[in-house]
Amino acid sequence: MCGFLKALLALAIVGHAAQVTQAADAAPTSPLPPTASAPVSPEELGFDEIVFVKRKPYSSDHYYTDVNNGTSPDRFLPENGIYVYNLRTGRERAVVTAAGMPGGKGFLGKISLSFDARQVVFDFRESPDRGFRVWEVGIDGAGLRQVSFPPDDEARKAARWGRPWHTDDVHPCYLPDGRIIFSSTRCEHTVLCGGSAHLVAPVLHCMAPDGTQIEQLSKSPVSEFCPVVLDDGRVMYHRWEYIDKGARVAKTIWTMNPDGSRPQEIYGLADDTTTVYMYPQPMPGNDHRVVCVGTCHYPQGGCVGAIMLIDAKTGNRARGPDPDEEGYVAFDGRYAVTNVTPHVFIERRTEPGWHFLADDGRYVHDRNGQSGHLYTHPYPVSDREFLVSYKVSPTDHYKDVANAYAIWLIDTDGNHRFVHRDARLSCWHPTPLRARRVPPSIQPVRDAEYAARDRALCVVTNVEHGMQGIERGEVKWLRINEALPRYWDTGRRWEPSLSSSAWKAALWPRVQWGVVPVEEDGSAYFEVPADRSVFFQALDENFRELQRERTYVNYRPGEVRSCNGCHGESGHVVPPVGSEAPLALRRAPSIPQPQPCDLAENGGDGRAGQVIHYPTDVQPIFDAKCVSCHGATDPADGLRLTGEPTLYYSTSYEELARKQLAGPIIPEFTSFLWGDRGNYNGAYLPPKSLGCPTSVLIAVLTDPAHPKNAEDDHSAMLDPWELMIVSRWVDTNYQFYGSYYGRHHWHWVNPDPKVPAYDPADFRRKATFDEAVGMFAPPWHR
C-alpha cells in the first residue's frame, strides 16, 4: 500500500476532519492512487475479453439530462462504438461503430450483454435532432438491428410538449424471458423543478424482443434509470424521488419484479445527502450488496464520481460521516455505505462539484473535476475487485477531454491496475465478455378481477408496528394519496414561478383517493388505484395525520401486496405472526371512501377522490369565520387571513407559510426561510413530525387551553366539517394548487388582449379530480 493511501486511512481511523478549500486556493492535487505493477491477467479474472463503449463523455449539465443536453453535436463521431478488448493479446476489435449505422456518426450510450454473451443491446442516437433508440448486435458484429422505433404518436407527443423534440429510449437490459427493459420518455413526464418544462423524466418500460408490446412499468413522477437483473430475477434500478423531501436528496436504488410489481427500496430513502447512487451492479452471489457510482446532482459528464459499496442489510440506513468530517472511519460497519475511493466524494451539502483529497491532507472543492480522479460504471469481477471507467489524469476536465477515461481494475484495498485505454476516445461500461446463469423468470400472479378495474390490493398487518410514540389503537384510518407526475401537456402556465403546487414546499400536487379503516389490531385490507404513485398517511379518529409515508409505491393492476407496518424504512424484521389472521383479512377489502367532510349531507360532493385546492377549499372558510378579526386592517395578532391574490398565491396562504403555522415546511427546493438548506430534508422523521400534530393553527382551532385562546376561544369556531377540511390541507405540506392545470400568475386575473381565447374565469381554476389525475390538459388549460 503506497504512502498516499496509508496517510488517507490514518486520517480516517483517528476521525480527522480535513479542511476543505476551493480549487483556486488548493495545494497541488493528489497523486495517482496506489498502482499495482502486476498486469491484469485472464486467469486472475476468469475471462479473456471485455466488451465496452468508446466515445467522448456526455456533455450533460445534470445527472438526469443525458437525453436532453448530453449529446452536443461534437459528440457524434464515426468511431463511436462497441468494442472488445482481449486481455491475452492486448488487441481490440470493433463490434459495431457509428460509421456503419444510420447517419454515419451517431452516439452510443449504455450497453447490456445477453446472458449467453452472444448479443449486445444498446441505446443509439443518430443525430442531435433524433431520439435515442434501442438496437441489438451480435458480439461478432453480425445481425445489427433496430429494436425500438419512434411511437406512432411521436408528433402529437412533441406537440403536447410544445418543443421541437422527440421521445428517447435508453439504458436497455435483457430480461430472463428474452424481453428488454429500458428507460423511456414515452411516459411524457418532465422533472418538477427548474424554470421551464424542457427537462424530461424517463421511467422504466419493457418490450418484446422484436420491439413490440411496449409497456410502461412505472408512473414515477421523476426519473428512473439503468435497470439490471439480479440473480433472483428481480430488476434493480436507480430512482429519483422527493415526496416531502428536498429535490437534491433521495437519488435512490430500488428493485422491482420484471413486470413492474413489488417495487422495493434497497437504499437511499433515509439518506440526507446530495449523493446520486447511479449505475448499481449486484455483487457476485449477493443481491443485497451493491456497487455503484456516487455522483453529484450537477455538473455532469455521464455520472462520474466515487465508487460506493452498499450493504442493504448492514448498519444505519443513513449515510455516515464524509471523509472530511469528524468521526469518519473507512469501511465503517455502523453504516450501509462505504466509499471505496475516499480521495473523491460528494459532500452532503455542497453542490455543484466534487471534493478531492490534496497532498497536504486538505479536501479541495472543484466544480470542473480538475483536482483529482473520477470514476464511473463499476462492474464487480469478485467481492473485492471492480472494472471501472477511470479519469486517469487528475487535471483533466470532467467532460471536456475526449480520452480522459480508461478501463482500470480497482479493489477494496485502494489498488489501481491499468487495463486498457484508447488514444482518442474514452472507454465506458466495461463488462466481462462471459456467459452468466440465466436468473429465474418471475411471473407474479395477479387478480384478474381487480386488474380489469385498474385496481390492486394492499394488506397492512399492523400499521402501528415501528411507529414510535403511537399508542395501540391510535391509528384509525389510512388516507390514500397520489403524487401526480407533471405531463408534457401541462405546459408551464404558472411561469415564471418555480413551483407549481406550493411556495417552495411541494413542487408537485397530491390528490386524495379516499380513506380506509384500520382495525383494532392495526391491520387494514383495501383497494388501491393501480399504476399510480401511491403513498399513505396514518390518521387518528379526527382524520388528522399521525405519520406520513414520504415515498410512493406503484401497484400494478391486479397486484396483491402486503407490508408489516409504517416503519419508514425497508429491511425491518417482520413481527411474529400469531395463530389468528389479522382482523382486516376476515372481511372483504375496503373500498376507499370519502372523509365525512366530503359526504353530500355535510356539504361535499360525495366522492372519495378529492383535489386539494387552497383557494376554493380553505379560503372560503377563512372568509366566513376568520377575516372579521384577521382582516386587512389591524389584523388580530398580526395574522391576516384575507384571500387577495398575490403574485403566485394569496395573502392568507403566504402568512401561514412564512410563519409555519400549519407545521414545519419541508421545502423541496431552495427555501425562502432557509435558503439552500431547502434542497435537503431527506432524513427519516418519526411520527407526529409534520402536519396537524405540529400545527399552531390546528392547536388553536382545537385546544381550549391553548394560550392563544385565553381571551378569545377559537376552539369551537369551525364546525366539524370545516375543521376536517382545514386539517386535511394542513397535512399536505402547504399545497396551494390542486393540479398542474390552469393559469396561476396574477397577470391572468384580467383578460389579456394578446390571448383573446383566455377566460379570466379560469384563473386559478380548481380542476376536477379526473382532470387533475389526467395525462391530457383540459380545454380550459390551453
Model-derived features: where do they sit?
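Bacterial N-terminal signal peptides
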Residues: 6-16
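Cleavable N-terminal signal peptides
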Residues: 10, 21-24
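Aromatic- and Gly/Pro-enriched helix-to-coil junctions and flexible linker segments
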Residues: 23-41, 45-47, 77, 437, ...
